[in-house]
Each structure stands twice: as structure tokens, then as C-alpha cells.
Amino acid sequence: MEIIHTPFGIDDPYFIVQGYEREPREPLEGDRVKVSFVTDPMVVGQRAWIEVQSDGKRYKRRAQYQLNHGGKAHWEVNIDGESAGVTVRYRFIAGRGPSTYVTSEWYEYTVCKWIEAKRFLSLKNNRLTVNRSDATSCDCLKEAYLLTDGKELYDLKIILEREEGERFYGLGEHFDAITIPEGEERYIHVYDQYKVQRSRGYAPVPFILSDRGRAILIDTGFLSSFKIDGSKITLSVYTKGCSIEGTEIQFWKEDSPLKAIEKIHKIARPCPPPLWALGPWLSANQWNSQKKVMEVLRETVQRDLPATTLVIEAWSDEQTFYIFNGAEYDPVSGDDKFSLKDFRFREPWPDPVEMINKLHERGIRLVLWQIPVIKSFDESTPQPAIDIRYGSSRGYFVRTRDGSDYRIPAARWHEGNVVVDFYNEEAAKWWASKREYLVEELGVDGFKTDGGEHLWGRDTLTAAGSAAKVRNTYPERYFETVSGILREEGILFSRAGYTRSPAHTLFWVGDEDSTWEALRDNITAGLNVSISGNPFWGWDIAGFSGEVPTMELYRRSIELAVFTPIFQLHSEDSGDPSPSSERTPWNLAKAWKDESIIDYYRNFASLRMTLSPYIYRESLHAAQASLPLTLPLFLIEKDNDPEGLAYLFGRDMVVSPAVDEEMKEESFFLKVNG
């Protein structure tokens, strides 16, 4: 029999793993602690206890059986509250009787308490730092507290005064509103929430901006949060057992919100896209063969549909993610890398060189999908296992506290697989070198750098420390690594992100359904990232998931996409779905038996091509001026409703999105003085 208990779960701020965790995860003075655990298998007549040691006391307490789920018995038991500084040790005993008892390992926690923090804070040049040795007066703070166990400093909570009527914006990607709602603690946590994200985001930023020109950036990789409530603004940093010393918060105040935005853009340093990335993009997860890609090219050419970028997601062996599916090769040692000549290409990608050349001849650039994990599930393709063994022996993967390779937890995306540690410079060079032939010999123009939200739990370790400290910044290192192998006009296109990600990548908000609600949510998220230092974004036009969109939703989305930074069609379904779910205009025409949608798409895609030089010019200006390319109108017109989603697109266009089905007018665009 096995006893299973995970005190912190996977440190998910939104979700407690019922039946396995400790609540609260980090007990405070006086907290009664509920402990849940599982015995596997469930045996009739089983009993279970907890044995506790704390401050010289020892006691055993019978655990209460809760339920049998999947042949496993779930139990709960409480531990008494203790004083701050007391270390509590506990373990479990279970079985039918003395001859069958099984005992778990010991677990422990030290009880913490909040203390007044101002004496541990240093404020210089509008930067607040947790610093024991160089603290200064911080009378500007209404209240400040630090969590301590009597030895180390952990979480930080700061309360600031809020001016009457002051409204706040920012937080990077969130989908529910432009104005930050009152009374809700909004976590900044890079999170792979599949659809219906609301306040959760793949690319949050710990930054808020007020309509009075006040701005705050929590410049840390730790989990953080903001709460706007009445007369207070509460900032929190959660370190999950790591020292908080050195954590920095930046404050600035300008004459206008627009002026205050400039600084977050200067910190993020967004890199403007090349001209070719500003035309229409085509993508579908079901394009899993050269034959399908060539069919897409033929449809595009024969129907005279403008396109500058094609994304292939399902191109690789789905294990190394750098070898084309079906390619034959002689395996190389883990420290070696392949050249193009090493492969004997077979179906479904018999000649990638010819395919890429044909795309390039038509002015279409190629972007290939990537993920920062390595899998090994097919013995007929030996290279993945070789790479994993070598990477493991060299310490190139994220690991656990016991020194073993970390594996993505069950029920999370890409569960059970190793994750590359990009904080290890040698690991980053090794991983990147495997992909160099794709750019240098095949001429790949960019990568869709998916993923990056894979580091779960404080006991997950990188070369830069615990995942508690670097989960949010991990995508930045991932993108920095991949950008190092690109050519001068190469691009990355990413979903995850954080404060400084825009220096390396373009971005899409998603993933979302093909619904009117999702259309509004996507534009909301795009404007939120614009406010927060990430100006070059797109979304999956008309949604990427579920049945194909209605004709009206598709039309409206195409219209609006012309006036957003990245214009991209994409669909989720893989393989050979029947009917096809790709969002290409010819497939929509087939699905709805209406060829007029092809002409409609062509007209707006052509308009996009006509506008591309303008968008390129304005992208350069946005980067140089440290301003959003899509600038919400309420930031310069006080009477404009933020939730109306109107925005400037560059300096010379105003966009008023028609994102609700009952809004029958076309989205409307006006020329304004520059």
C-alpha cells in the first residue's frame, strides 16, 4: 500500500488538488490545518492516523475516511494551531492492523506570522527593495507587512492609498475587462488556462496604471497580485518559501496615463516586426503533411488570396520537435547535432526543401511550431531517447529537489515529459544547436514558440533557483534562446509571456472559441497587453476552437483583424477532421455553401496588404516612442468608455470594434490628423 500526500499540490493559485494537499499550504499563527491524503489501494477495514510532533508535543489522531475514488481511499485529519516560529512535523500511518501498517515519510512546516515591514524596505529613486541591511524610511506607504517564520523573510504585502474615483488598468493579458474590477485579488501567474480565461492569462504583467498617471511595476518572477478595493491598493508577492530579499517594486507618476505608459514600454523593449510579418497569415493544426501545405498554396494562388506567412504546427516527430515527421536518419550522440544532409526525408514530408522554396517563390515565409519539452514514446525513432539521456546526464533539464529530472505533472499540458532548463546556458546552447539547420540550411523564417507555462511547484528547480521564483520569467529565457538562431528578419510568435518577453517575440492572445463572446474577450486581452508594454499582438481570427464560425462572425472578425497588429487565421483540430475545421475562406465557403466569403476575405486581405507599409511605419514609431500600436482611446480622451474598446491604430486611424452580434454596422475607421 502507498500513502500519497502533496502538501503544496503544484502551487496552483487557482486550484487546490482535493484529497492530497494541506490547507492552508503555509499555515499562520493559530491556524488549524486540514491535511488530506490518499491510501492506494483502498482495502476493506483500513484505518489511518496522523502522528504529529511540535514544540515538544507529540500526539496521534485518527484520520476520517472521506471516499473511495478509483480504488483509492481519501482521508482528512486536522493539526492543531501553533505559535509563530514553531516547526510542525507529521506523518501518516495506515493499514488494517499492526501487521499491515504502512508509515509515510515525515512532512513539516514552520508556522509564520505577518510583521510590520517598513524597517526592512529601502526606497531609492522610486524603487522599493526588500533589503535588511540598507533599509530607509518608507513613510509613503500606508501599510507594509512581511511574512516571517522568525528567521527568514518571505511574502510581502503593501497597502497604498487610492485617490477617490481613481481607476486602474494593465496587468498584461486578461480577458474580462479593461478597467481592473474592484474587490478581486488579481494574480500575476503565467498560466495555461484553456479557453474562457477571464482573469487568468498566459502572458500577465505585474503592472498597473491609473487614470491619474500613477504606475506600479512589481519587478519579480514570484507570484504576485494586485487588489483595488475602496480607498486601498494592495500589492502582494508570494515567494512560496523562498527569501524575498532583493525583490523590487517600481513606482512612477506622470502628468498623464499616456506618459506613464512610456516607461513600461521602455522596460519591455518591444521589437517591431518585419514588413513580411504584417501581411495575412495562414495556419491550421490539421496541416500535417507536405501534400496539405501544397494544397493550401495552390488554393491561395488560384484564388488570388494575399498571404505572407504560413505556420505549420504538426510538422515534427512530436518528440524532439526538431526532426521532420517520417524522416529517416542515423542517430547521433546526444552532444551532436544534425545537418540537412543527415536526413532521408519520407512521407508525410518527402521534400521540405522543395516545399519551402515554393513558399518563398510566392513571397510566403514559413514559421514552424516549437515547445520547450522533449518526449520519447516511439522506439522506432531513437534520437529522442538519446537526447533525453544525454541532457539528463548533463543537468540540462529542470529538476526536482531530489536531483531527478522534473516531469510535467499529471493533467497538465504535455504531462510526464522533461522540460529544458534555459537558465542553464549550456543547456540553452545545446537545445538551440539542434535547430540551427532548420534556419541555416532549410531557410525557416521563424518559430511559433508555444508553451512556456510548464514549471509547477516550489520543489521544481532550475539553474536560477526554484520555480516559485522563475516560473513567470521562464518564457523570457525560452524566447531569448530561440531568437538567437534566427536570421535578421526572423520572428517568434508566442502565447506565453511576461514583462520583458516583447523584446524577443510577437504575441497572440488566446486560445478561444469561435463565438461572439470570445471575439470581445480577445480584443479586450489585446488592448490590455498593449497597455502593459506588449504592442505587437494578434489573435486567431474568429476563434480557433469548435465548429467553424458563423459567416457574420467570420466577416466581422476579418474586418477587425485588418486593423490589429497581426492578421492570423488558425484552427485547433489535428489530423484529418471531417468536416474540416480550418478557418481558411475556401473552407468556410464549403461549410456554409457560400462562395461570396472568398471574395469578401480577398478584399480585406488585400486591404491589409495595402496597409502593411503604414502598419510597419507605425510599428517602428510605436517601438521608438514607447507607445502601444493599438492605443486605447480612453487614455487620451477622458470621456471615452474603456469597455467600448475603441483605439488608435497607429497615429492616423481610429478603430471602433463591432464585437457584439447585435451591432449590425461594420466596424468603423476614421482618418484623423497625425
Annotated model-derived regions:
Residues A94-P274, S283-Q286, Q290-Q302:
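Catalytic and substrate-binding clefts that recognize carbohydrates or anionic sugar/phosphate headgroups
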Residues D304, G484-I485, Y498, F567-G674:
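Carbohydrate-binding surfaces of carbohydrate-active enzymes
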Residues S376-D387, L455-A464, I491-D521, I531, ...:
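Substrate-binding cleft/loops of secretory-pathway carbohydrate-active enzymes
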